[in-house]
Amino acid sequence: MQLSLDSKVALITGGSRGIGAAAVRLFVEAGAKVVFNYQSAKAKADELVRECGAANCRAVQCELSSPVAAAHLVSSAVEAFGRLDILVANHGIWPPEDTPIDKMTDEHWLRTIAVNLNSVFGLIKHSVAQMKKQERQVESAKGDRPPVPTGHIVLVSSTAGQRGEAFHCDYAASKGALISMVKGLSTELARDNIRVNCVAPGWVATDMSADALADPPTRAKVFATIPLGRVGTTEEIAGPILFLCTPYAGFITGEIFNVNGGAVLVG
C-alpha cells in the first residue's frame, strides 16, 4: 500500500500559497486531480498550475466568505474533473493586530467567523451532497455497500482552537468550532463511508506569520513555547493532511491531528 491518490479528485482551499500550495503539490504528486481556490494572488495560482500541470490542477478565483461562495467552488471542482472525493478546508484569516474583546468591532468578529467558519459549513454541506451521490452510484452499480470510504474531509484548525488565544478570541472561536464540527460530523457521516478529521498546526513559516516571526523578541518568545525549538514548514503540515486522505488512514475518523512541534503539550 502506498500514499497514492490515483483517480481521486481533491478540492483544497487556500491553495495558492503556504500550507495550501504545499498540499496541492503533494496531492498532485500522489496522483490526485486537484482544484484549489485563490482570492487575489492570481500570479501565484497560475504559477502553481503551470508547475503541477493543467491536466492535473485547476485554479478558481473565489473569495470564501459565505456558504454561497463555497457552493460555487464545490460546483467548479465537480465541473472540472467530474467528481469530488476529498475536501481539504485549509483557508482562513488571522487578523494580526491584538484586539481586546471590549475593543473588537462587530465587523471584525463577523468577518473572521464568515471566512473561517461559515464558508467551511458551506463547503462541507455541498461536498457531502456530492460524495453521497457518488456513493449511491457505486452501490447501484455493484449491488452492495462499498468496502472503502467514499469521501475524505480534512479541516485545518489551529492550536488556538484547542487552548484559545488572548486578544484573538475571534480566531480561536472559529478554529475551535472546526474541531467540534469534526467530532460531530465524523459520527454522522461514518455510515456514508465519509471520514472527517482535523489537522491542527501551531506556528508555521508562511507569509501569514512572516511579520510576527521577523520581530526578534516575538520570534524568541514563540520558539520558547515549542519543544522542538522551531516553527514548522508548510510541507510538514501538508504531509499529515495527505496521509489522512490515503488508505493508510482508512480506520481514522474524528481525530484532531496535532502538528505543532509539541507546543500544545506545554501551552
Predicted regions located by residue number:
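Short C-terminal tail/terminal secondary-structure segment
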Residues: 98, 163, 241-242, 253-267
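Substrate-binding pocket helix/loop in short-chain dehydrogenase/reductase
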Residues: 97-101, 105-113, 222
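Conserved glycine-rich Rossmann-like NAD(P)H-binding loop of the short-chain dehydrogenase/reductase
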Residues: 30-47
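Alpha-helical segment proximal to the catalytic Tyr-Lys
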Residues: 129, 187-191, 250
